[in-house]
Amino acid sequence: MVVYNGYQLSKRKPLIKLAQEKLDRVDFERLARTGHFLDRVEERNINLNKISSTKMKRATIYEVKLEENEIISVGIRVSYNKKQVACMIIGFKTETPMVVTSWLMERK
């Protein structure tokens, strides 16, 4: 497994484009949630219903995980409210893309 983020990711434009194409095909209104994500909803106090598909289209990719040259997950940052952004890991290892985990961060 190889993880590209930050500077490593910025040097791999084709990988970013491929990850963006995968994200564009995801129906965020019906996105499945993993058990790991569901266990932490209360703890992390995040409501995915506040994140519209329009906000998802403007999301920033900050991490891509590869396994045998296949994208297995993409990390994105998306606007949550005026003070915070939601960081999400979307997994593509199964047939249906799923939210693996997410958390809130203060805007910088």
Predicted regions and their residues:
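Ribonuclease/tRNase effector modules and their secretory precursors
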Residues: 1-108
